[in-house]
Amino acid sequence: MAQKSKAYRAAAEKIEAGKYYTPTEAVALAKETGSAKFNSTVEVALKLGVDPRKADQMVRGTVILPHGTGKTARVIVFATGPAAEAAIAAGADEVGGSDLIEKVAGGYTDFDSAVSTPELMGQVGRLGKVLGPRGLMPNPKTGTVTPDVAKAVFDIKGGKIEFRVDKHANVHFVVGKAGFTADQLNDNIKVALDEVVRLKPSAAKGRYIQKGAVSTTFGPGIPLDVNAI
């Protein structure tokens, strides 16, 4: 633990007090401060000027990162018949109908994303207590409730990420690994930030993106210049 603390302090010392970095500058610093022992995950966190308690100010979306996340997502699909066959062919990690629903109801959550055909959502809906708190419940708004389950699997495994504002008006998402090139990380961050900006609720007043930071696993947050977003 002491070694981690020492590494954290060493990384934090490279961040200038009171300075706000452009996304490009933050990426360069994140790569420099990321752990050399393993390929750290790079994340972006934003504080939005919205009231998540109001339905017309909810920010939720998906975006396909051009260079992926650096991790192959585990995807399960609730489907039967031809749709199940298509999901298997697309590379889904587990596919099933009532059997898979029962497995998840029993507490199985060893996956990163869940997809369902519309026909099975009546049964999948009862998994809300298991999937809801983990952000894994299939939803038409994020393309995870669809008759074209194969495309959903392709997209998710190809680098599609989901994000949604939490009750404190924060949103965070993975944009890659510290081992990515700076150009790859910059491309991913730009695409993700552009989508967050595009989804600004019309009911939101004042500054939309109030604060932001880029960080690596166990690393300090590098404050973003929100005027550069």
Curated annotation (Swiss-Prot):
**Does rRNA-binding appear among the keywords?**
yes
A molecular function (GO) held by this record is:
rRNA binding
Please name the GO terms of the biological process aspect recorded for this protein, alphabetically: regulation of translation; translation
Going by the UniProt record, its keywords in alphabetical order are: Repressor, Ribonucleoprotein, Ribosomal protein, RNA-binding, rRNA-binding, Translation regulation, tRNA-binding
Q: Span of the secretion signal?
A: none
* Annotated Gene3D superfamilies: 3.30.190.20, 3.40.50.790
The Swiss-Prot or TrEMBL record describes its family as follows:
Belongs to the universal ribosomal protein uL1 family.
According to its UniProt entry, the function of this protein is described as:
Binds directly to 23S rRNA. The L1 stalk is quite mobile in the ribosome, and is involved in E site tRNA release. Protein L1 is also a translational repressor protein, it controls the translation of the L11 operon by binding to its mRNA.
Q: What is this protein called?
A: Large ribosomal subunit protein uL1
